[in-house]
Each structure stands twice: as C-alpha cells, then as structure tokens.
Amino acid sequence: MAGNTFGRALRLTTFGESHGPGLGGIIDGCPAGLELTEAHIQAELDRRKPGQGPTATKRKEADTVRLLSGVFEGCTTGTPIAFFIANEDQRSRDYGNLAEAFRPGHADWAYFQKYNGLRDHRGGGRSSGRETAARVAGGVIAKKILARRGVTILGGCVELGGIAAPLWGLDMDGAAARPYCAAAPSVVSQWDALVAEARKAGETLGGIVRIEAHNVPAGLGEPVFDKLDAVLAHAVMSVGAVKGVEVGEGFAAAALRGSQNNDPLLPADAPEPGRARFASNHAGGILGGISSGQDIVLRVAVKPIASIAVTQKTVDRQGQPVDILIGGRHDLSAIPRIVPVLEAMTALALADALLLQQRMGLGL
C-alpha cells in the first residue's frame, strides 16, 4: 500500500492495523542531539489513548510506546527512530458480521474496490483511527525540533455537534485540561447535554478543531506546488475523520472585501530593514504559501464517527441488500482524541518545512 509516508526532510512512515499485533512508525531525518525518551512520547499518547472522557470508546489500550532505535542515552543519534505500540484490548469477534457487509460511512467499500476484494474487516484494519497513535508519537519528535526555534502548537475544540464556543472567550492555553479539549470553558455544560442526548439516541457527533502555531519564523514553505498552507492541508486532511480545513479566515474570506481581508503592515516597534508587524491576521500566518512570521491558525472540520448504534441499510459482497447494526466499542465523537493528532500533523509539516529551509541554506 503506497501513501504511508509523510514529509521530505523529516519523514514519518507508519504501519499496523487496529486488530493486529500493534502499530508503529519510523522517523527519518531527525537531527542528532534532541532529548527524547519513551516518557516524552507517552505523555502525548496518553492524551489520545482510548477509554477516557465522555465521548471515548470503552476499548482500553495502555498505548505503551517502545523506542526501538535512533536514541542512545536519552538523545537522538541522527539515525532512523523506530517505535512500536502494542494492541492489547482488541475484540475481533465484535466484527464477525462485517466480513461480508460494508459499513456506511466507513472505508470498507472503497478498500474492497481498491484492493481487489481484500480487506481487514476487524475494526477497519489500516483505515481505523487507531493508526493515528503512530502519528502522535512521530509528532512528539517534530515538536521537539520546532521547540528549538521556540515554536509551540496548541489545539482545542471550538465546535461540537453544531454548538460553537464564543470566539471572544477562547482560551487555547487551557484547552488540553478541559473536557472535550474545549477552547472555551463556557461551552462545556452545553456539550455535556448534547453528548448525553446523542448517546441516548445511538448517534455520534462531529465538530471543529482550532490549531494555532506560535512563533513560526517567516520564510517557511515553497512558492508554488508546495505552499505551506497546501502542505498543512495535506497533513491534516490525511487524518481519516477530517473533511475540511481553513487557514486564517478561510471560507469566511469569500464574503469579505479586499480592504477587510488584507492585513496591513506596520513598522516594527524598533524599525529596521526586514522587520515589520501586522495590524491583523486574516491570512492565518501564511502569504503566498510562505509563513509571514505571524501565528498560523487552522480550523479543521471533523465528521461524526461513522459507527452508530442504529440499524442501517447496506449491501453485502454479493451486492444483496442487508440491514446491519454495528457492534464493538466506538467513540461517540473523534473529539477530543483527534486534537493531539492534528497537533502532531501540524508539527510534522512545520518541522519538515523548517528542515527543508535549513537544507537549502536559506537561514533559520
């Protein structure tokens, strides 16, 4: 299967399936000398792991990571970094009835068509959201590369099931500690009621996640086919539940006039050649596909989980109509577990762009 590797200077390859022995990845291109331990990776994996929070699946996975190579005495060596995360609580018997039928909203039908009728029906196999654990592990390394330049990445949920957090009340710094990774504390009680209602109805919920990257240096990204916003969109759209991404004002910019959407440049506090500041950030930190030095701001649309506790119509392998009720243990929403995944993919894209810029000898 092609398409398992992301990046050019910093490359992450992931492997594994939802109900196989485990999953993992290899990071190639990481500089030597970064402090890295299993505990560093585990802290981020614990944010994503199943079995915690009001919307999470009841599947219990420790998601304990093992570093297999590329690290010596707590530091990266510059060689490929391999890691592995065992699957410990898979229940494949829950999926026996899905060997012959295709689940609506899942990748079952598309995989069946692409791979000549061969697919792992147990929990979706390679298409399962469980694959994203390896992305989170790789993202830890990318975040460490960025931290050397003072770059930080924050994520938080700004909308769940159509109920949006007030833009004026966002507190991204505290999002990770709140239920749903909520970017505003005022909306949590409304989301609690919505989740209870959806659970009673056997339904699932989608939402919108906001990602911010702070202290990103100006000059990252390439001017044509590898624009930084295009690479970031590629990164986050590769996550299975993601259906859309906005940079800065995004689709709202279509309703603005140029005078409203432009970000005026102002002299820096201490004016000098090559320095300026902006009066606003409608562009989301990217101009002409290249970082401007402002915060990069993304809004990511996350679809409802396709596994619902409601009988659905579908067809079997012979094309005959059947009704299915999906068993197993499933999230009520990809939120909040998807937040560290989106942070990781943003970090991988930015770290890759940073290393490419350095490789080209263009400063930074």
Swiss-Prot record:
<dbReference type="GO" id="GO:0010181">
    <property type="term" value="F:FMN binding"/>
</dbReference>
<dbReference type="InterPro" id="IPR000453">
    <property type="entry name" value="Chorismate_synth"/>
</dbReference>
<keyword id="KW-0285">Flavoprotein</keyword>
<keyword id="KW-0274">FAD</keyword>
<dbReference type="InterPro" id="IPR035904">
    <property type="entry name" value="Chorismate_synth_AroC_sf"/>
</dbReference>
<feature type="binding site">
    <location>
        <position position="288"/>
    </location>
    <ligand>
        <name>FMN</name>
    </ligand>
</feature>
<protein>
    <recommendedName>
        <fullName>Chorismate synthase</fullName>
        <ecNumber>4.2.3.5</ecNumber>
    </recommendedName>
</protein>
<dbReference type="GO" id="GO:0008652">
    <property type="term" value="P:amino acid biosynthetic process"/>
</dbReference>
<keyword id="KW-0456">Lyase</keyword>
<feature type="binding site">
    <location>
        <position position="329"/>
    </location>
    <ligand>
        <name>FMN</name>
    </ligand>
</feature>
<comment type="pathway">
    <text>Metabolic intermediate biosynthesis; chorismate biosynthesis; chorismate from D-erythrose 4-phosphate and phosphoenolpyruvate: step 7/7.</text>
</comment>
<feature type="binding site">
    <location>
        <begin position="126"/>
        <end position="128"/>
    </location>
    <ligand>
        <name>FMN</name>
    </ligand>
</feature>
<comment type="similarity">
    <text>Belongs to the chorismate synthase family.</text>
</comment>
<dbReference type="GO" id="GO:0009423">
    <property type="term" value="P:chorismate biosynthetic process"/>
</dbReference>
<dbReference type="GO" id="GO:0009073">
    <property type="term" value="P:aromatic amino acid family biosynthetic process"/>
</dbReference>
<comment type="function">
    <text>This reaction introduces a second double bond into the aromatic ring system.</text>
</comment>
<feature type="binding site">
    <location>
        <begin position="303"/>
        <end position="307"/>
    </location>
    <ligand>
        <name>FMN</name>
    </ligand>
</feature>
<keyword id="KW-0521">NADP</keyword>
<dbReference type="Pfam" id="PF01264">
    <property type="entry name" value="Chorismate_synt"/>
</dbReference>
<dbReference type="GO" id="GO:0005829">
    <property type="term" value="C:cytosol"/>
</dbReference>
<dbReference type="InterPro" id="IPR020541">
    <property type="entry name" value="Chorismate_synthase_CS"/>
</dbReference>
<keyword id="KW-0057">Aromatic amino acid biosynthesis</keyword>
<keyword id="KW-0288">FMN</keyword>
<feature type="binding site">
    <location>
        <position position="48"/>
    </location>
    <ligand>
        <name>NADP(+)</name>
    </ligand>
</feature>
<comment type="subunit">
    <text>Homotetramer.</text>
</comment>
<keyword id="KW-0028">Amino-acid biosynthesis</keyword>
<dbReference type="GO" id="GO:0004107">
    <property type="term" value="F:chorismate synthase activity"/>
</dbReference>
